Curated annotation (Swiss-Prot):
Keyword DNA damage assigned: no
Binding site for substrate: 84, 227-229, 278, 393-395
Organism: Leifsonia xyli subsp. xyli (strain CTCB07)
GO MF terms held by the record: GTP binding; manganese ion binding; phosphoenolpyruvate carboxykinase (GTP) activity
Pathway: Carbohydrate biosynthesis; gluconeogenesis
Name of encoding gene: pckG
Protein name: Phosphoenolpyruvate carboxykinase [GTP]
Amino acid sequence: MTAPPRPTAPPGAAALTGLAALHAWVDELAALLQPDGIVWCDGSRGQTDRLTKQLVAEGKLIRLNPEWRPNSFLSRTDPSDVARVEDRTFICSLDEADAGPTNNWREPEGMRAELREAFAGSMRGRTLYVVPFSMGPIGGPLSQLGVQLTDSAYVAVSMGIMTRVASAVLDLIAAGQPWVPTVHSVGAPLVDEAGVRQEDVAWPCNPVKYIVQFPETREIWSYGSGYGGNAILAKKCFALRIASVMARDEGWLAEHMLIVKVTSPEGRVFHFAAAFPSSCGKTNLAMLKPSIPGWTVETVCDDIAWLRPGPDGRLRAINPEAGFFGVAPGTGELTNKTAVEALWGNTIFTNVALRDDGDVWWEGLTAEPPAHLIDWEGNDWTPASGRPAAHPNSRFTVSAAQCPVIADEWDVVDGVPIDAILFGGRRATNVPLVAQARDWKHGVFIGATISSEQTAAAEGTVGELRRDPFAMLPFCGYNMADYWAHWLRMGEKLGADAPAIFQVNWFRKGDDGRFLWPGFSENARVIEWIARRVEGSAGAEETAIGRLPLADELDLDGLGLPAEDLAALFDIDTERWLAECALTEQYFARFGPRVPPALTAELASLRDKLRA
């Protein structure tokens, strides 16, 4: 679309607002970035089609066979630009202590000078795309606005899938609504300082990368990468790092969580939010197909949730995104048929393999690979090649509306009421299949101590733990201990209306090293018990680590689970748990006196209960 009309600010205005502020910001950045031209994005199908045709003509997208994947494309990144770069991700708070020990901190003014030098002229020879977007339904009470500047048409198109890009966003900005400014450049100008133009490449990027968040001013600057979360700034950068700071200041929660709508055979509806670190079954739970009759699970969101107390006092949540940016390998007919069905068309695939018939393939999509492929780097591939055909972090970008089990409420403006919150890691030892927290404080302690075992456990010990509190380790925009305190305050505010909190672990292993629980669709049996606990129809046994299902409370009909495996799934080894308490104490020590006293009290209480 053309740029919106420029209102004039009153003479002597101390600060511009509305569209005047937006235009002034775009003008200021354009002077720094020096693009050849500026295009304002409106999210329309016509503009998106023009951009994808342009990307195909430039060799940056490959159009897939429309018979197999209508309106779908494949992109191949530079081999150096395939994932988030956590070591080049910075939280530039005014006070280093506010970033905390889990974030990379840099002094803000020094970083600003560094960024201005990197961004100066970075868009010479390229087009600057202005992308106004809404996180959450446009105009909703839980939604937020942003504007991204980018020199990547691939990013502009991806933003149109992952967020709500529309001219209506500009109407809200014109009316005075605040917005988050985000700036992105691949850092590969096509014209040098002498005016000499060079040829473009299929995936421009720069060896030097910056992904920088300024919490106090709600700004995001990203340089050097065209990949996913580094470049689609609405995702992790805004929806979690900046939004978590906004949530702290404004009394809500921005979380790395899925939300599912669960309906019982009696027709009762529940909404569960769940936080899982990577490789812990998050997407599979978000799109769960229950193995037990009468229960249905529908997707509200698969990755990020924003939660805020509603007018009725209950915690309500929205999906701030409009699309899925999922990991392709391992997504197949057997593991997640729902996700595969969502990818029928209108999808951008990145770094997967190309079949000879013009469709895509990745490891895990089918049991047997095709006889010949073009791999993610553009080379011939056969099953004898001895290397993956798709990159392990290859992705699909698709509208959430295409998910065959998307809940009708996935984009309601005031969100859905949350009945329970689940936390889970990948634990071979100690953590039972499911346990309910005694209360909100105990639940926050569980969330703060989420971990996955990185090494095999020696006999009688716990393996090395990778801590990922609330699954927010790479994404919390401020001091993690302050984040825990914010969760505790939220519990005080919610009071008796607070959701119940549970811990789940699909990955407990037996002494012989095999998984004790079948997982996948059978996880619905655990979800059923959680739902029954929420409605008050299932019993529980009080233990040192939380409330466990009473005998025969879990529906195991037809599962064929040996009694000894069931016992092992809920076994509480006192010595191993005391050893884990020592590891938790060491972990809390990283945060010094900022750890909330309520959490150190929970740790002490856990030790007392184990020794009782």
